[in-house]
Amino acid sequence: MAPVPDPNSVGGGAKRDEATTKIPSKDSKKKDDKKEEDLSEEDLQLKQNLELYVERVQDPNPELQKIALESMRKEIRDSTSSMTSVPKPLKFLRPHYGVLKEFHAKMAESDLKKMLADILSVLALTMSAEGERESLNYRLNGSESDIGSWGHEYVRNLAGEIAKEYTIRQGEESSIEDLMDLVQQIVSFHMKHNAETEAVDLLMDVEDLDLLLEHVDNTNFRRTCNYLTSAAKYLPGPDDMLVLDIAYMIYIKFAEYPNALQIALFLDNMQYVKQVFTSCTDLVKKKQFCYMIARHGMTFELDQEMVANDEDKEALQDIVNNSKLSEGYLTLARDIEVMEAKTPEDIYKAHLLDGRASSGPSVDSARQNLSATFVNAFVNAGFGQDKLMTVPSDSTSGSAGNWLFKNKEHGKTSAVASLGMIQLWDVETGLGHLDKYFHSNDNPVVAGALLGVGIVNCGIKNDCDPAFALLSGYIDNEDSSVRIGAIMGLGIAYAGSQNDQIKIRLSPILNDANAPLDVIAFAALSLGMIYVGSCNEEVAQSIIFALMDRSEAELGEALTRFLPLGLGLLYLGKQESVEATAEVSKTFNEKIRKYCDMTLLSCAYAGTGNVLKVQDLLAQCGEHLVKGDIHQGPAVIGLAMVAMSEELGLDMEIRSLERVLQYGEQNIRRAVPLALGLLCISNPKVTVMDTLSRLSHDTDSEVAMAAIISLGLIGAGTNNARIAGMLRNLSSYYYKDASLLFCVRIAQGFVHMGKGLLTLNPFHSERLLLSPTALAGIVTLLHACLDMKSIILGKYHYVLYFLVLAMQPRMMLTVDQSLKPISVPVRVGQAVDVVGQAGRPKTITGFQTHSTPVLLAAGERAELATEKYIPLSPILEGFVILKENPDYREE
């Protein structure tokens, strides 16, 4: 027997409800009554009031109309001050929206019509059809009353409609004055209510960022500028530069000079840099500016305008010239207690491996000794002492002389040059150590001494120009290895300096029909480095003619790739400026034409994150290979160069490269590890580490070599234990293959670079600024790695020393106003992006407290853990001057 359904049971009730909802009542009045019964007394009262107001608004008596409109306005205003859900008045007025619109259209021009337009503008917020922009139209016809009284949501909606209307009017070329008056009001409202980001967005949409300058004040200019600088990364040119210009002006307006200087450096605008110096009157602050310029690797001459007093000017110029770098670096090394020299064996840790590899050939092979030379140079870089080259000559075993002669011909060049690396940044001592090798009759030794002079002077400027004085005499030597030593030395010592004396000496070599190809290639590369990012026409012409003069056979040589690279470096990061040269490159011999095109494109857009260029380069990678084409290598490296500027693009690029690996042809697979190495340089991301580890066992030895070198690059200067372990295992895996073992050793040298105190990352100042010289050094090495066998495993292994351009201490060293190091507690943790967030959120997470000097890993940020001092730099990296806080009270 079927159970009798209980009319009060839940199920039955639910069914009944369903039935009532499904069948619409014929009598709509009953339905309305039912709805009204659901309302609370207050809501019912409000609904009835609003309906009454709607009727009164249509009353012929203007007095009644006015009272009704004012009452309606009050109800709506009270409810829209905060919008968590659609306010009740807007709900209840929904059915009457059409009626009010019709009545508004019929009304004669009067203040009452404007009042009604204001109310309709707010109602349109929830009621107008998509894309009609009714809210804005009624606002423009309404009164001039305060826009903010209707609440944030209304203002935000209006801003969105203005942006669309602006675009349409620009297309029609009609007047936008009425819109701009409204924009003024909205921006003013946003800036007063901590919504700086929305104000900036609106002004970007209506292309009038200059308005910001009127509306920023002391409380919100920092947040505004932070947003401007981070938004600039995602804007197409030339908008990005305009946005940064505004940020610069705001910083100058509020005397926030260190931040202004950073933007001036980013824009590469020398006038702005000078303006920062002339606007600021505080000498100690100027010292901090000098440290910032020195870290950027910029050649900069101070003049009377910037610093009036000669003595002060000299002291400041010393800082710009980086003459304090070695001292600071060694202070850090002593503090962390890593001064003791390390031998290559300390790095290889062969005792940790099982017997096979460690009991390998015990005879000294030239290649093993060469790799030990490099490992020794990179690991002890800048420490001024090691156990192979700087040992006093009286100790018999392993003295410098002995070690030098364990290397064969061109190996001696790298061995002597390694002295420059060990004495890095300490010019006087370094030149003293190298001096004796100039008197040698052995050309490779002299070449090494010349290169060593260049390395020791890297990034250090000196009034008496010792590098030029020593090297210029050897530029036209008969022996090509000596010439290359001098030319490379000049390129490294004067990178980024745009030194005309050197141009006068090196340019003739490019067009000398009798000069050997390798000398011409290195001359082009050195000129590219000295004039990096300068777009210098003369140098570009010289390199273009040199490329046109090459014979078919020479264009097939491995070193020829340095000519297009030298040309590309002239336009590093300069975007459209490269176009004329790129057109000329289309006339080159087809053997080098595409290679040149890819190199120019990737250099010009390096660090810009330009999505369209990434797509162009990916398209090149997708083409099928025609025999003899070598242009896809630089295209893959170009992908990394363009996309490395910000985190989002970088992660996207890593994923794209995974696809390129899967579907690309063999020559592309050889370049992918190098691109990954550049994207994560000195920043060992686990996913990339695993990919490279997989590729390091690839059946194609070129892919394996590139992956091994890249493992070294992503771990460069980090002492990363996991990468060190991988490389140790690879050294036992490849113990029979001299070439691959050489690559493993080089990578081990990179990982332990400067005993873990250095970084190769070309970005600094919290990834805002890109040092062009540093990137030039890294890219040169990567292009050389595209043909490992001919260049790095051939006789041009000293190309590895170009990396010195990117080597910088990853330290934060605090000094007092007289530039003496002081130790203060600082918190070091993962940096958090707080741009556009409300309030004052924490800028670091997961921090530890240390005493300065401290090391900063990739993605880390430091902040002072004491209020006793105020830092003069907004970004705590490198040398930071602290001044005592006058308001500080000891507890």
Swiss-Prot record:
InterPro entries in the record: 26S_Psome_Rpn1, ARM-like, ARM-type_fold, Proteasome/cyclosome_rpt, RPN1_C, RPN1_N
Q: In which tissues is it expressed?
A: Expressed in stems, leaves, buds, flowers, siliques and developing seeds.
PC repeat feature ranges: 414-447, 448-484, 485-519, 522-556, 565-594, 674-705, 724-739
Membrane spanning residue stretches: none
Report which superkingdom the organism of origin falls in: Eukaryota
Chain intervals with Basic and acidic residues compositional bias? 14-37
Q: Which GO terms describe its biological process?
A: protein catabolic process; regulation of protein catabolic process
**Single annotated GO MF:** enzyme regulator activity
Q: Which SUPFAM superfamilies match?
A: ARM repeat
Keywords assigned by UniProt, alphabetized = Proteasome, Repeat, Ubl conjugation
UniProt PTM comment = Ubiquitinated.
A GO cellular component annotated for this chain's UniProt record is: plasma membrane
Q: What happens when the gene is disrupted?
A: Normal phenotype.
Show the segment(s) annotated as Disordered.
Answer: 1-43
Job description of the protein: Acts as a regulatory subunit of the 26 proteasome which is involved in the ATP-dependent degradation of ubiquitinated proteins.
Q: How does it assemble?
A: Component of the 19S regulatory particle (RP/PA700) base subcomplex of the 26S proteasome. The 26S proteasome is composed of a core protease (CP), known as the 20S proteasome, capped at one or both ends by the 19S regulatory particle (RP/PA700). The RP/PA700 complex is composed of at least 17 different subunits in two subcomplexes, the base and the lid, which form the portions proximal and distal to the 20S proteolytic core, respectively.
Family per UniProt? Belongs to the proteasome subunit S2 family.
Q: What name does UniProt use for this protein?
A: 26S proteasome non-ATPase regulatory subunit 2 homolog B
Q: Where does this protein come from, organism-wise?
A: Arabidopsis thaliana (Mouse-ear cress)
Q: Which gene encodes it?
A: RPN1B
